[in-house]
A protein has these predicted regions:
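Metabolite-binding pocket within alpha/beta catalytic cores that recognizes anionic/polar moieties
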Residues: 1-154
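Non-catalytic positions within long, well-ordered alpha-helices that form the structural scaffold/packing
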Residues: 98-102, 200, 219
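Short acidic/polar active-site loop segments enriched in Thr and Asp
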Residues: 104, 205, 224
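Polyanion-binding loop/helix "lid" in catalytic or ligand-binding cores
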Residues: 147-158, 184, 196, 252-264
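Active-site/ligand-binding-proximal alpha/beta "capping" segment
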Residues: 163, 169-205, 263
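Zn-dependent metallopeptidase/amidohydrolase metal-coordination segment
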Residues: 209-247
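His/Asp/Glu-rich mid-to-C-terminal helical/loop segments that flank catalytic regions of hydrolases
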Residues: 236-270
């Protein structure tokens, strides 16, 4: 796997020598943020040898290199998911690659279902911790010694220091911020009401199909991690509404301006 990472990095370096300080993964419906930054270079996933390609509507499938204010960043405009048929090692390959490019901190964003009944569609949730019991760990298999230790500590996946910065950014921007635990399930189907009752009993506040595995891979290689979920719908059984992907995009569009404001402030502050 490390050789594959090196090959992907070489492929990118043939196209740009841009060195990001921070990385951002843009979730479903949130990819338009990449159009708002000062862009220096775009590298499509299809241009990178051996790179997994996103197939989901609302995920463009490219790295965007550029600046948020004066901060050099790399944005993933579209991620790959386990449910697309990729191995978990391939799912986290882009995260690891951004770390190898030079990014020391990563902001993970996603569209998520609200499990906590006090949440509402359009809320932002600071991810304080996660549950990945239902999906394979990206660290299964031979350990990549060049990246990190065999048995990494996960007692603080999401940096408490960065969490405090996000809280301050939200307050400064006048944007209400929920907080909670994110649980990653496999997808692509939405969850049943019984499954939602189960994860709520585990302590989950939001549910989705990505992010936690990327956070684990990033922490394994020593990156500082923070995360924000956009609650685009209430999970099955929490409300009577039927679930569909169009609703995810509609809610993300509705809060796009607040998302842009919050993410810009966070990137410059972390």
């Amino acid at each position: 796997m490390y050789k594959k990472l090196e090959k992907c990095l070489k492929s990118i370096r043939e196209k740009t020598d841009f060195k990001p300080e921070k990385a951002v993964i843009l979730g479903s419906g949130l990819g338009d943020y990449a159009e708002k930054i000062k862009r220096e270079k775009i590298v499509k996933y299809t241009e990178i040898e051996g790179f997994p390609v996103s197939t989901v509507q609302g995920h463009k499938g490219q790295f965007v290199f550029g600046y948020v204010k004066d901060v050099p960043v790399v944005l993933m405009q579209g991620r790959v998911h386990y449910y697309e048929g990729y191995s978990m090692q391939d799912v986290v390959l882009p995260t690891r690659l951004m770390g190898m490019m030079g990014a020391k901190k990563v902001l993970l964003t996603n569209a998520a279902g609200g499990v906590n009944p006090s949440f509402r569609p359009g809320d932002f949730m600071l991810i304080t911790d996660h549950i990945t019991t239902a999906v394979p760990s990206p660290l299964i298999g031979p350990n990549i010694e060049e990246l990190g230790t065999r048995f990494p500590d996960m007692s603080e996946v999401y940096s408490k220091k960065l969490q405090d910065i996000i809280r301050k950014s939200a307050k400064d921007c006048g944007i209400p911020l929920q907080e909670g635990v994110y649980v990653q399930l496999t997808g692509p189907n939405y969850e049943t009401p019984a499954e939602i009752r189960m994860v709520r009993s585990w302590g989950a506040d939001a549910v989705g199909m990505s992010t936690a595995c990327e956070a684990m891979a990033a922490r394994h290689m020593g990156m500082e991690v923070c995360g924000i979920s956009c609650i685009t719908n209430m999970a099955a059984g929490v409300s009577d509404a039927k679930l569909n992907h169009a609703e995810v995009q509609e809610t993300a569009d509705r809060v796009a301006k607040d998302f842009e404001k919050l993410v810009t402030d966070v990137i410059t502050a972390i």
